[in-house]
Amino acid sequence: MKRLSTKVILIATVLVFMSSCAPPQPTKIVPAEFKTGQDYYHKVCANCHGADALGKQTRAPGLIDPEYLSENFSDEEMYKQIIEGSDKMRPQRNKLSDPEVAEIIKYIRYSQKAADLVVGEDESDEDEDQ
């Protein structure tokens, strides 16, 4: 009996560990034209930037933020950041092709628009707090 309970605990521990290693799954349904980008995002980006790209309780910043809108951070800059990385982000050039990066950027831009972000949103929020 003791041996059986030890095996059950061991199996349960392994299953919990394995499920925690899986990339976060999409949390929202997106139009078909953005689904491919969402899939690539969840395979490569979501572990750090969060399943919903908000970055809450993750190692990396949220991308659904006015700082990363195209007016502040162009598609070319985002592409370069993804491919080349930075001191805070590993390069993803070995994980993604150019078309895959383009799909991810398209998905991020869609997600930003869906969140109704506008440039300067943070500043207006600060003014309201004062």
Regions found by a protein language model. Give the residues of each.
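Bacterial N-terminal signal peptides that target proteins for export
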Residues: 1-9
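Classic N-terminal secretory signal peptides
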Residues: 10-15
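C-terminal motif of bacterial Sec signal peptides marking the signal peptidase cleavage site
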Residues: 17-20
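Detector for the c-type heme attachment site
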Residues: 22, 48-54, 83, 109-110
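A general structural signal marking secondary-structure boundaries and capping sites
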Residues: 52, 67, 86, 111-115
